[in-house]
């Protein structure tokens, strides 16, 4: 279960992801889920933790209920319209950029997120899903065997951030975290 500070960071980074992918055109639920998964996976591969979304195998690649709930919550708070950050989200993005500047691990997280968006943002949803389904992971049932996600049973857990050890994590000092939360309407 995510802690309140993790939820705040997840929502702020989700807004950043939506902002970063916006120039690439139409975005839908499936593509957003796949981009979130790829970002989180790449961060873990680099020993970093930023998003705290648990992902399961779904009909279209990977799916996170936490990511879905955060998106709905940001829509209710009028920080997201469809899949684009609203005017009310601009303060959140400014505060997040301030939290990133000069903090090595935070800068690395944003670099990874941007690299994923640059690589997969221009692709359509089905192409991104195919890329996700080609990723090889081990499952809790078979921890020594790596399988492409397309061969893993539906609803099987793919990523559990709380169980993954990393060398550093995206951090925001408490006062700025409170300002981020307020800027998001919480």
Feature map (PLM): residue ranges:
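Domain-edge interaction signal
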Residues: 1-186
């Amino acid at each position: 279960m995510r802690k309140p500070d993790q939820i705040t960071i997840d929502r702020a980074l989700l807004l950043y992801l939506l902002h970063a992918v916006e120039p690439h055109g139409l975005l839908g639920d499936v593509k957003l889920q796949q981009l979130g998964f790829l970002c989180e996976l790449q961060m873990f591969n680099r020993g970093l933790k930023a998003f705290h979304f648990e992902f399961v195998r779904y009909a279209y690649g990977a799916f996170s209920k936490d990511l879905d709930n955060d998106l709905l919550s940001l829509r209710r708070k009028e920080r997201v319209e469809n899949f684009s950050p609203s005017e009310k989200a601009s303060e959140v993005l400014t505060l997040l950029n301030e939290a990133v500047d000069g903090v090595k691990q935070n800068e690395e997280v944003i670099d990874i997120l941007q690299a994923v968006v640059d690589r997969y943002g221009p692709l359509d949803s089905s192409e991104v899903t195919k890329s996700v389904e080609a990723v090889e992971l081990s499952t809790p049932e078979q921890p020594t065997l790596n399988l492409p996600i397309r061969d893993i049973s539906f609803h099987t857990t793919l990523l559990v951030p709380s169980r993954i050890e990393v060398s550093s994590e995206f951090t925001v000092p408490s006062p700025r975290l409170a300002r981020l939360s307020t800027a998001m309407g919480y």
